[in-house]
Amino acid sequence: EFGRTIYSQGKLTKTNHGRDHHSRCFTTWVAGGGFKAGYEHGQTDDHSYNIVKDPVHINDLNATLLQQMGIDHERLTYRFLGLDQRLTGVEGAKVIPQLVA
């Protein structure tokens, strides 16, 4: 996953006003499903460029979402190019307990 930078690169015009991809930080929100209401997790520096507190890997977020749906992320697989793959990768994704009510 990726977020968007808070700044625009290049000259701003009517046709060029987008922001670049930002691979270090991204924002998402979830509602219901046993997640904490009004909870903010993680923090970036003053320039919203680097993570300074509680980083989360997308695989950990996926593991948490799957758990809240009653699905064991380590057992859920799909076939791709002849191999069983997991949405949470093979590197030991973990549920983020701070997000769960």
Feature annotation, model-predicted:
Residues 2-101:
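Ligand-binding pockets and gating/stacking loops
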